[in-house]
Amino acid sequence: MKNVLLIEDDMLISNLVKFRLKKDGYEVTIVEDGQAGIEAIDTLSPDLIITDVMMPFRNGLEIINHAKMVNPKVPVIVLSSLGEEENTVLEAFTIGASDFIPKPFKPNELSFRVKKWLKYAS
């Protein structure tokens, strides 16, 4: 079973994502801030990471940098509000983000992209 690490401080979004991905057969670990995300990357070795950009303690760009240092091949999907600056999105791709999904998003779209990136990474 593939392990997905979700780093998101909005519990409503976290629960929605977890419900959908568990339905698809994935193991989902949720952490609520960037520092906990860094620690989870080190201890869990996730197959895929989904991260918000704006979070307490560490931001999504720091998450991407750390994830790519630990495992350059791990796919990282960035979830972010439509109001995020374009430069932040471009920087996320520059440092190694695999995909970007604007909030609000459709659970089916997220499910499709997770499946695609896990297949691509294997």
Label each residue range with its predicted role:
Residues E8:
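Conserved acidic carboxylate
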Residues D33-A36, N59-E62:
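Acidic catalytic/metal-coordinating carboxylates
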Residues E62, G83-D99:
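Alpha4 helix (beta4-alpha4-beta5 surface) of REC/receiver domains from two-component response regulators
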Residues L79-S80:
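Hydrophobic/aromatic residues positioned on beta-strands within the core alpha/beta folds
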Residues M55:
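Receiver (REC) domain active-site loop signature in two-component systems and cognate sites
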Residues M11-T29, W117:
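Two-component/phosphorelay signaling modules centered on CheY-like receiver
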Residues D52:
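Active-site residues of response regulator receiver
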Residues F105-V114:
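C-terminal output helix
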